[in-house]
A protein has these predicted regions:
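Expand to "…catalyze enediolate/carbanion chemistry for C-C bond making/breaking, isomerization
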Residues: 1-264
Length: 264
């Protein structure tokens, strides 16, 4: 491990011990994570007993799921589940593409993150056979705002609180666990606290860090620590890929020189 990775471990230890961090996030979807960097992340998080949550590219991203199994993630999240049929496709993949003993060790969540998904949520909660294969739902507030032609600053509004409360109440009636994500920051403390007080969420998440619902009681420092971890992670990635780039640039220069000489 290098100096940056040891610093990441220090931040993660603080997040785990003092801030209520319970999982670390990664994405094949918007983040476009590569297997090499995910194996490094898994090495770091495993040393501290923090499991990885992986967002896959879609409800039928079979290759992503197989990569999740190879890494050994604790939870898989499917994005943009907007209709009962999308939920069915996700449940079908879980049932038919993942061995039961593997599936038993993984929590399967899906994201409700568009106004279309919200409008169809009651119908999705009526799909009992498909719900049997999933463990929970996370609301992605930034994409939800975008689907409503709203700025991300709207995510802590009363309108969004009403949407989240109604969605989570329906999910709770079906025994699902509930998570909140999307522009989670110090400004979200009251929003999170109100949902937690009603017993409607189990966790909330920043871009890279997942907290237990009651972690909001630790105050603003948890969000600063989450940002610090993300910063160290990005610096670690930059260090690795900068090294690869330098190696490739040296090789490119040599090949261009050799090709130029052969044409003369």
């Amino acid at each position: 491990m290098n100096e940056l990775e040891y610093k990441m471990m220090d931040v993660l230890k603080f997040l785990r011990d003092e801030c209520g961090c319970v999982q670390i996030k990664a994405e094949f979807e918007a983040e476009g994570a590569r297997m090499s960097e995910l194996m490094r992340l898994k090495d770091i998080t495993s040393r501290l007993g923090l499991p990885i949550v992986m967002k896959i590219g879609g409800v039928e991203s079979v290759t992503d799921v197989y990569n999740c199994l190879q890494i050994g993630v604790a939870s898989i999240v499917a994005p943009m589940v907007e209709t009962p049929y999308a939920l069915h496709k996700y449940a079908h993949m879980i049932e038919h593409m993942i061995a039961p003993d593997n599936a038993a060790d993984i929590d399967f969540f899906f994201n409700m993150e568009t106004i279309t998904g919200y409008r169809n949520f009651a119908a999705m909660m009526a799909a009992e056979a498909d719900l049997a294969h999933v463990d929970g739902v996370t609301i992605g507030r930034v994409d939800l705002a975008g689907s409503m032609a709203l700025d991300r600053s709207a995510v802590d509004s009363e309108e969004f609180f009403a949407i989240c409360r109604e969605t989570f109440r329906m999910a709770r009636e079906k025994g699902l666990r509930c998570g909140l994500g999307g522009a989670i920051s110090e400004r979200s403390v009251e929003f999170i606290g109100r949902l937690a007080a009603e017993g409607l969420i189990d966790k909330f998440e920043t871009r890279k860090v997942v907290f237990a619902a009651d972690a909001v009681e630790h105050g603003p420092r948890i969000f600063r620590a989450a940002l610090d971890f993300e910063l160290q992670w990005l610096k670690s990635k930059r260090r690795f890929y900068s090294g690869v780039r330098r190696e490739d640039e040296a090789r490119i220069a040599m090949l261009e020189q050799r090709l130029g000489a052969s044409r003369e």
